[in-house]
């Protein structure tokens, strides 16, 4: 079965559409730094908008990119790219962008959260679109410098000019994404699937599955060190195999015993009740319930996050993991 989506590549994107336009990248963290440098190296006019002078300000200067206070960066910008954390964007928008941006400037996002959940209400005369790279900022930069690119998603929320998609693809080309491929989506789809993946697999699901497996073995009297290797440490090797060869490639690489055990017991553990709760988690995302809770949590200083992190840091598996990582490092051959 082939991919059902159109995949945009370099031939579908034209940098000339945005050459000569002033691009303000807001934020200079992982993604902000990568985007700003890649767009600059693609021959585009880039400035960085920051709320205060500090380490990021000096880093931008050392990278050869002009840092400005956010208000100054956006006032002459034709394209404004939000690359600050989700929960910072609304305040930044209300205080430092909306009152100062010029009429008709494009608003660009790397994640749909604030637009989809209406935390930011964009002007009716602005094009609003998204380019969401499927990799961390350092990888976006590294691949670009090596002549490649990280795949991305592209979406248009508001197309006043009639050329929003074309400009989005030009930005995607500027950061190197069209070298790999850019898949069209919507703000709704990107936001909901991104949150779902984080919650049930990438962060929440994997974390709780590892911890539950480790604790089960320890409670049954097995050595914590052995339990850690079998339930947590070896996960990387399997994930690397899936990343490189897919799920079937991973299965071909493991022992027949592992294949049989995985195919039988895996469905016993991850059964229909788990799938039902996954759907419930998805409904919380789709209804906006999760977003409401997260905004409230953030406003209270993130007590759930702070307490949860403390719990993990003080857990037996974390203490054992710290010790075993030292052993692994000692055993690595000297380069």
Curated annotation (Swiss-Prot):
Positions that bind substrate: 255
Cofactor note: Binds 2 magnesium ions per subunit.
Catalytic residues (UniProt): 111
Keywords, in A-Z order: Amino-acid biosynthesis, Branched-chain amino acid biosynthesis, Magnesium, Metal-binding, NADP, Oxidoreductase
Coiled-coil ranges (or none): none
Domain KARI N-terminal Rossmann residue range list: 5-185
Binding annotation for Mg(2+) 2: 194, 230, 234
Reaction catalysis annotation: (2R)-2,3-dihydroxy-3-methylbutanoate + NADP(+) = (2S)-2-acetolactate + NADPH + H(+); (2R,3R)-2,3-dihydroxy-3-methylpentanoate + NADP(+) = (S)-2-ethyl-2-hydroxy-3-oxobutanoate + NADPH + H(+)
KARI C-terminal knotted domain location: 186-331
Enzyme Commission code: 1.1.1.86
Enzyme's top EC category: oxidoreductase
Residues annotated to bind Mg(2+) 1: 194, 198
Pathway: Amino-acid biosynthesis; L-isoleucine biosynthesis; L-isoleucine from 2-oxobutanoate: step 2/4; Amino-acid biosynthesis; L-valine biosynthesis; L-valine from pyruvate: step 2/4
GO MF, one annotated term: NADP binding
Positions of NADP(+) binding: 28-31, 56, 86-89, 137
One of the GO BP terms on file: isoleucine biosynthetic process
Function according to Swiss-Prot or TrEMBL: Involved in the biosynthesis of branched-chain amino acids (BCAA). Catalyzes an alkyl-migration followed by a ketol-acid reduction of (S)-2-acetolactate (S2AL) to yield (R)-2,3-dihydroxy-isovalerate. In the isomerase reaction, S2AL is rearranged via a Mg-dependent methyl migration to produce 3-hydroxy-3-methyl-2-ketobutyrate (HMKB). In the reductase reaction, this 2-ketoacid undergoes a metal-dependent reduction by NADPH to yield (R)-2,3-dihydroxy-isovalerate.
Stored HAMAP family: IlvC (MF_00435)
Family (UniProt): Belongs to the ketol-acid reductoisomerase family.
Protein name: Ketol-acid reductoisomerase (NADP(+))
Organism annotation: Saccharolobus solfataricus (strain ATCC 35092 / DSM 1617 / JCM 11322 / P2) (Sulfolobus solfataricus)
Lineage summary: Archaea, Thermoproteota, Thermoprotei, Sulfolobales, Sulfolobaceae
Gene that specifies this protein: ilvC
């Amino acid at each position: 079965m082939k991919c059902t989506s159109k995949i945009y590549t370099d031939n579908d994107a034209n940098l000339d559409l945005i050459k000569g336009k002033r691009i303000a990248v807001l934020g200079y963290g992982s993604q902000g730094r990568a985007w700003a440098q890649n767009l600059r190296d693609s021959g585009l006019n880039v400035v960085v908008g920051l709320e205060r002078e500090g380490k990021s300000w000096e880093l931008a200067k050392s990278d050869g990119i002009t840092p400005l206070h956010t208000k100054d960066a956006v006032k002459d910008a034709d394209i404004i790219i939000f690359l600050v954390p989700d929960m910072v964007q609304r305040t930044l928008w209300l205080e430092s962008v909306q009152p100062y941006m010029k009429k008709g400037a494009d608003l660009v996002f790397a994640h749909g959260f604030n637009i989809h959940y209406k935390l930011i209400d964009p002007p009716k005369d602005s094009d609003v679109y998204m380019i969401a790279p499927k990799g961390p900022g350092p990888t976006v930069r590294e691949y670009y410098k090596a002549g490649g690119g990280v795949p991305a998603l592209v979406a248009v929320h508001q197309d006043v000019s009639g050329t929003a998609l074309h400009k989005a693809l030009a930005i995607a080309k500027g950061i190197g994404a069209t070298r790999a491929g850019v898949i069209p989506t919507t703000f709704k789809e990107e936001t909901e699937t991104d949150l779902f993946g984080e919650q049930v697999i990438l962060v929440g699901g994997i974390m709780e599955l590892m911890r539950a497996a480790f604790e089960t073995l320890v409670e049954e009297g097995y050595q914590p060190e052995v339990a850690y290797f079998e339930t947590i440490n070896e996960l990387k090797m399997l994930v690397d195999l899936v990343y490189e060869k897919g799920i079937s490639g991973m299965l071909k690489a493991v022992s027949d015993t592992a294949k049989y055990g995985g195919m039988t017991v895996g469905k016993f553990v991850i059964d229909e009740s788990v799938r039902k709760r996954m759907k419930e988690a998805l409904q919380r995302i789709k209804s906006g319930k999760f977003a409401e809770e997260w905004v409230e949590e953030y406003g209270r200083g993130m007590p759930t996050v702070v307490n949860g992190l403390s719990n993990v840091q003080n857990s037996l598996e974390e203490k054992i993991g710290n010790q075993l990582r030292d052993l692994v490092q000692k055993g690595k051959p000297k380069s």
